[in-house]
Amino acid sequence: MLLAPGDVIKRSSEELKQRQIQINLVDWTESEGGKENKTEPKEESKAEGSKDGEGTQSESGQKEEGGKETKDADVDRRIHTAVGSGSSTKGPGERANENADRGDGKVGGGGGDADAGVGATGTNGRRWVVLTEEIARAIESKYGTKIDVYRDEVPAQIIEVERSLQKELGISREGVAEQTERSRDLRRKEKNGTHAKAVERGGRKQRKESHGDAQREGVEEEKTSEEPARIGITIEGVMSQNKLLSMIGGVERKMAPIGARESAVMLVSNSIKDVVRATAYFTAPTGDPHWKEVAREASKKKNILAYTSTGGDAKTEFLHLIDHL
């Protein structure tokens, strides 16, 4: 039997049912002012909202969740950051659902074809890239789409994975820090005009070589003066899985569930009453106010196995532990 924080168990309830593992979940949210509904899966709230057009029959907690989801979606659509004077880009996330349903391999906003699931095409036929190797590996592992890492090329269209999606992909703290550092460095360079100056130097050299034709030189000078306004780096903040998939293509890979017969875990619980018969416990940052007491009592037991989150996504680590016990 495995002890774990209540919110981690609740987030993993569907996967635990697939594994035929029993759940003993002590509800801690009633005393917290009815916050229980905030942890309900988004899919359920969304489905109920679509069945009840007016939404008056939904519980207040589900209304809050629906509002939160809409707010997240709006923020996701707005969070487009064009650094410097890069080319204008329409947020691909605005047509995420349409592109996902269409299934023709075209990426929203780009108008290009994904090469058999390899790479990701953005606007103007250019490809989306990410800032770190860890993020590229996580995307390929989860969605089956190979995506390149930014190598200081200009122009470029960069996906910046934000907090909620970092957890979904299981990005480590080190990986998050590395992305933040690279993003800040790029913004600093673009603000100082590093990339624009490089373009202008190239234009001046070309004009010097063709100085014999005054008219041609004038046209070229006009063209070059406009070039820095068209060339730059676009950084697109991505919070949701749907938006990411609309940009890079691919689908989420579903891991084959491991049944209870293949796992040593038969029951998971957050109840202090189950400490007596527990054989292991998993601890992670949690919103379960009673978990601290449960973990303290569990740590007093002899011959109990203790596991701690490494700082990644607690749900992913919890299920990984269950599958390997």
From Swiss-Prot:
- What EC number(s) would the UniProt record show? 3.6.4.13
Pfam family for this entry, one: Orbi_VP6
- List the InterPro entries: Orbi_VP6
Residues annotated as binding ATP are: K106
Nucleotide-binding recorded as keyword = yes
Q: Where in or outside the cell is it found?
A: Virion
Comp. bias intervals (Gly residues): 106-122
Disulfide connectivity for this sequence is none
| Reaction(s) this enzyme catalyzes, per UniProt | ATP + H2O = ADP + phosphate + H(+)
Tell me the superkingdom of the source.
Answer: Viruses
Q: Single GO cellular component annotation?
A: viral inner capsid
Q: How is the subunit organization of this protein annotated in UniProt?
A: Homohexamer.
Give the family, as the similarity comment puts it: Belongs to the orbivirus VP6 family.
Stated role: ATP dependent RNA helicase essential for RNA packaging and viral transcription. Possesses ss- and dsRNA-binding capacity.
Name of the protein in question: Helicase VP6-A
